[in-house]
Curated annotation (Swiss-Prot):
GO CC annotation, single: cytoplasm
Catalytic activity: (S)-2,3,4,5-tetrahydrodipicolinate + succinyl-CoA + H2O = (S)-2-succinylamino-6-oxoheptanedioate + CoA
Annotated positions binding substrate: R104, D141
Subunit structure, interactors included: Homotrimer.
Source taxonomy: Bacteria, Pseudomonadati, Pseudomonadota, Betaproteobacteria, Neisseriales
InterPro entries: DapD_Trfase_Hexpep_rpt_fam, Hexapep, Hexapep_transf_CS, THP_succinylTrfase_dom1, THP_succinylTrfase_N_sf, Trimer_LpxA-like_sf
E.C. number: 2.3.1.117
Source organism of the structure: Neisseria meningitidis serogroup A / serotype 4A (strain DSM 15465 / Z2491)
Pathway(s) served: Amino-acid biosynthesis; L-lysine biosynthesis via DAP pathway; LL-2,6-diaminopimelate from (S)-tetrahydrodipicolinate (succinylase route): step 1/3
Chloroplast as UniProt keyword: no
Protein name, per record: 2,3,4,5-tetrahydropyridine-2,6-dicarboxylate N-succinyltransferase
Name of the encoding gene: dapD
Pfam families: Hexapep_2, THDPS_N_2
EC class name: transferase
Compartment(s): Cytoplasm
Length: 273
């Protein structure tokens, strides 16, 4: 049986799987899947085009199964002790392994095993959860969190305190995705499988979930669940039908193409909106 088939079959019987009852075949299949996620050979979601992604549900199933086949144990990274089922990604790495991986991880940065961090990434004191994928050149700034299975594109900047939500269940749901060359402003939260399409700028303190209305003030269109490519987004509000109150929304104040985005600083894009 293929790795995927073993995982799919085991997941159907997951209620019966414990650290003591799991078969050697299933345990090795789960651990191999986690190893492939950790190395970047396998991804929870694969990009088909701008805003279009295919979810590998079986990889998410393997992550969920990994919690069932392992007991909590004391983990020690040389500085702190933890009690968990998932070791940190580079707790026992040598200097050569760090050099080969090609990213920086400053003191206080935590990534769980089963997450992938590409070359030229900088991890400030931050957290990257299992199943996540952080692509080349990304910056994960101080106290930013990358949730389980989240996909972070090339050259993305996650500013201080940003939260990128994790999505393990429902299995068919897409993870939260930040596509290439996006900027996410400080303390913003992107959650519940929202896709921020490439080249977008999210201002400081913007909160976007699946139910958040994203209003394009130029066209009058309202989006939910995705931020169109090249959008510059700030916090706003929309009046109720009777005008008695307003509710939070995100507002697309302008669109920029890749050429403009490359030549213009984030502050300039947000100035005079």
């Amino acid at each position: 049986m293929s790795l995927q088939n073993i995982i799919e079959t085991a997941f159907e019987n997951r209620a019966d799987i414990t650290p003591t009852t799991v078969t050697p075949e299933v345990k090795e299949a789960v651990l191999e899947t986690i190893r492939q996620l950790d190395s970047g050979k396998l991804r929870v979601a694969e990009r088909l085009g701008v805003g279009e992604w295919k979810v590998n549900e079986w990889a998410k199933k393997a992550v969920l199964l990994s919690f069932r086949i392992q007991d909590n144990e004391v983990l020690n990274d040389g500085v702190n002790k933890y009690f968990d089922k998932v070791p940190t990604k580079f707790a026992d790495w040598s200097e050569d392994e760090f050099k080969n991986a090609g990213f920086r991880a400053v003191p206080g940065a935590v990534a769980r095993r089963g997450s992938f961090v590409a070359k030229n990434v900088v991890l400030m004191p931050s957290y990257v959860n299992i199943g996540a994928y952080v692509d080349e050149g990304a910056m994960v700034d101080t106290w930013a969190t990358v949730g389980s299975c989240a996909q972070i594109g090339k050259n993305v900047h996650l500013s201080g305190g940003v939260g990128i939500g994790g999505v393990l269940e429902p299995l068919q749901a897409s993870p939260t995705i930040i596509e290439d060359n996006c900027f996410i402003g400080a303390r913003s939260e992107i959650v519940e499988g929202v896709i921020v399409e490439e080249g977008s700028v999210i201002s400081m303190g913007v909160f976007i979930g699946q139910s958040t209305k994203i209003f394009d003030r130029t066209t009058g269109e309202i989006y939910q669940g995705r931020v169109p490519a090249g959008s510059v987004v700030v916090s706003g509000s929309m009046p109720s039908k009777d005008g008695s109150h307003s509710l939070y929304c995100a507002v697309i104040v302008k669109r920029v193409d890749a050429q403009t985005r490359a030549k213009t600083s984030v502050n300039e894009l947000l100035r005079g909106i």
